[in-house]
Amino acid sequence: CTELQLMQSIAEAQPDVILHTAAISDTGYTEQHPEEAYRANVELPLWLARAAAQCGARLVGFSSDQVYAGVQQPGSLPETMELSPANVYGRQKLEMEQRMLDACPDTVLLRATWMYDLPSYGLPIRGNLPLNLIKATVYGEKLRFSNCDYRGITYVRQAVENLVPAADLPGGVYNYGSGNAENMVCLIEAVDWQRNLAMDCGKLRGYGIRFDTTQEGIYHCLNDYGVADL
């Protein structure tokens, strides 16, 4: 697909809203294949922004909490802070945000957290925190936790439900997902460093878009699937 082909397809469809969620989001793969990832994570979203500006469509795109990777500041992180992401994926997403807004200032960019759901409807699903907790409970496995890792994780159904009002937000960047002030899962307990990806979503709440806290969201998900009493 070329940029011209993409612009022609969008011009023919005349959409009111374009929702862009695709990315090469595996941080390890992105480190190993930065050029391939750059095309998916920066160039193609930029083409969409130019096409949206040309046809007058509203563009909503997903960024990532990985833009905050490497920050030393404690507490919930606002959209306005200076950023210098510590990994390739975070740097690419930050560049994507800047270039999309330059091309189409009306674009809404959502810095999404790690998300989760439980297996259902025959759809593929990757490992996630609630699923790992359920497996550990059922099979008597041990999990490791650390006080050095902070991030919110979000029930994907709530993220989807909030996309409709998000499409009406003013153009700009928004932290999007469940907040979390508690320690999160860290696979290597002995590593002596702290990671903080916990985002301040107050800007989003100012427009009436709300998420459960990370803890509330997990209970919400488990209740939806009838496994809260495991």
Predicted segments with their positions:
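Catalytic helix-loop patch of NAD(P)-dependent Rossmann-fold dehydrogenases
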Residues: 39, 43-47, 67-110, 115-116, ...
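NAD(P)-dependent short-chain dehydrogenase/reductase
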Residues: 98-151, 158
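NAD(P)-cofactor binding segment of oxidoreductase domains
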Residues: 18, 32-60
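Helix C-cap/helix->beta junction micro-motif
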Residues: 13, 54-55, 103
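Conserved catalytic-core motifs of eukaryotic protein kinase domains, centered on the activation segment
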Residues: 28-35, 70-74, 121
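NAD(P)H-binding glycine-rich loop region in Rossmannoid oxidoreductase-like domains
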Residues: 1-40
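Mid/C-terminal beta-alpha module of Rossmann-like enzyme folds, strongest
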Residues: 159-200, 212, 220, 225-230
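SDR active-site strand-loop-helix element
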Residues: 18-22, 59-65, 71, 110-112
